[in-house]
Amino acid sequence: MSYVITDETKLTGIIGRPIKQSFSPKIHNGAFQYLNLNYIYIPFEVVQQDLSKTVEAMKVLKFRGFNVTMPHKREVMNYLDEVSENAKIIGAVNTVVNQNGKLVGHNTDGKGYVQSLEDEGIYVKEKTFVIAGAGGAARSVAVQLALDGAKKITILNRTIDKAHDIAQLIGMSIPNVHIEINCLENKTLAKAVEEADVLINTTSLGMYSMEEESIIGEEKVLPSNLVVSDLIYNPAKTKLLQQAESRGCKTINGLGMLIGQAAIAFELWTEVAMPIDYIKKTLFTR
């Protein structure tokens, strides 16, 4: 199908630095074309000192919306007219919607993760989760799990201060969930997963160029009834997921979250559901 840009084409995009590694243009433009929507998604590399001017330009040019990636997810909140509840708690925005000239910030990362679980028949309410890592992704996921009714969340990180920050944030904002923290070590992880429903790796261990690394030393610490989830999607099967499979665990990689968070943004902009099956089959099948 030909893809013709006209004066009626609705503009969307992504701002960040670096930006060339982003899969978002591939996902969104693929979905726009498949659905024959007159939209386009453009990546923009934006340095920090130009962020406020860029956001204002998006409003002036009547962008329907845009994504925000590192390093601007926090600072962009200063230049928006409104921010959603979960984005306020997380303290970061990754999606902006232009609502009749008012820029509204959202965070779809955690929601995209929860959607990826639900797509596999796993529902958050009253479940017990163990999260390895305490960076931005862990924060987004932990907050959304708490908002959606998780029973208990244990956060393990090599530097416990960052885990404490997330626990304190959730404790102040969402008091009905039980939060524990500890250092990320073989012993503490083994103990934490004994009674957990889902283990989530949010660290970089196992990603491309670190394929032989894992958050666990020996797979025997993983109970066979544990769901093991890795936010990494390249490679599709990390060492952690291989270890989990050898124990009979159900495994989920990060592709579902990647597409899930994009799908939520897509629908906020277009009011049309993203063709998720098409995106998975045609854009991410090797």
Curated annotation (Swiss-Prot):
InterPro entries: Aminoacid_DH-like_N_sf, NAD(P)-bd_dom_sf, SDH_C, Shikimate_DH, Shikimate_DH-bd_N, Shikimate_DH_fam, Shikm_DH/Glu-tRNA_Rdtase. One of its GO terms (biological process) is aromatic amino acid family biosynthetic process. Its EC number is 1.1.1.25. The active site is at K73. Shikimate binds at S22, F23, S24, T69, N94, D109, Y233. GO terms for molecular function: NADP binding; shikimate 3-dehydrogenase (NADP+) activity. Pathway: Metabolic intermediate biosynthesis; chorismate biosynthesis; chorismate from D-erythrose 4-phosphate and phosphoenolpyruvate: step 4/7. NADP(+) binds at E85, G133, A134, G135, G136, A137, N157, R158, T159, I160, D161, K162, L231, G254. It catalyses: shikimate + NADP(+) = 3-dehydroshikimate + NADPH + H(+). Keywords: Amino-acid biosynthesis, Aromatic amino acid biosynthesis, NADP, Oxidoreductase. It holds the Pfam family Shikimate_dh_N. CDD domains: NAD_bind_Shikimate_DH. Homodimer. Belongs to the shikimate dehydrogenase family. Involved in the biosynthesis of the chorismate, which leads to the biosynthesis of aromatic amino acids. Catalyzes the reversible NADPH linked reduction of 3-dehydroshikimate (DHSA) to yield shikimate (SA). PANTHER family: BIFUNCTIONAL 3-DEHYDROQUINATE DEHYDRATASE_SHIKIMATE DEHYDROGENASE, CHLOROPLASTIC, SHIKIMATE DEHYDROGENASE. HAMAP family: Shikimate_DH_AroE. This is Shikimate dehydrogenase (NADP(+)).
